[in-house]
């Protein structure tokens, strides 16, 4: 699922987000994540899985209510636009990353709560949804307490040094 525009960055990320994190992937292999400032209001995450080349992601953050969001550009080869997710930092020692539930967002499009359309995601990644609603409307939808179950945990990292 992608969005036509990113969420506007409205404040710096919490300092606890920066640094080195570690986890295990779905196969139990080590996964390392290093997050740093990238200039302006952007941040850079470099993810390294065992036996694979590092992958770099540039993202911005915004905070609304008690929730932190991230927006990252999607590579053109995968259709472009922006990915939106959420994150929490637990006691400065644990980073939890959330994705949005695709089925619930598709239902919101079907009910006209959001404007969007189905898309084919390149490289055999199946069907996708592109949300065309302006960022203000997307935020109102994400912040609605009725949609609190919209966020699905996709990764949990432990602090692995400063």
Predicted regions, residues:
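Calycin-type beta-barrel ligand-binding domains and close structural analogs
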Residues: 1-18, 24-31, 36-162
């Amino acid at each position: 699922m992608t969005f036509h525009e990113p969420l506007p960055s409205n404040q710096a990320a919490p300092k606890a987000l920066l640094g080195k994190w570690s986890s295990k992937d779905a196969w139990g292999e080590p996964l390392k994540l290093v997050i740093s400032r990238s200039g302006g209001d952007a941040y850079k995450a470099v993810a390294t899985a065992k036996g694979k080349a590092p992958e770099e992601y540039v993202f911005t953050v915004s905070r609304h209510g008690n929730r932190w969001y991230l927006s990252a550009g999607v590579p053109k080869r995968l259709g472009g636009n922006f990915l939106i997710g959420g994150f929490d930092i637990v006691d400065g020692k644990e980073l939890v990353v959330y994705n949005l539930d695709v089925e619930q967002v598709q239902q919101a499009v079907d009910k006209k709560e959001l404007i969007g359309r189905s898309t084919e995601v390149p490289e055999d990644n199946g069907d996708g949804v592109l949300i065309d609603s302006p960022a203000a409307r997307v935020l109102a939808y994400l912040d609605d307490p009725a949609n609190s179950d919209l966020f699905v945990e996709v990764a949990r990292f432990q602090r692995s040094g400063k």
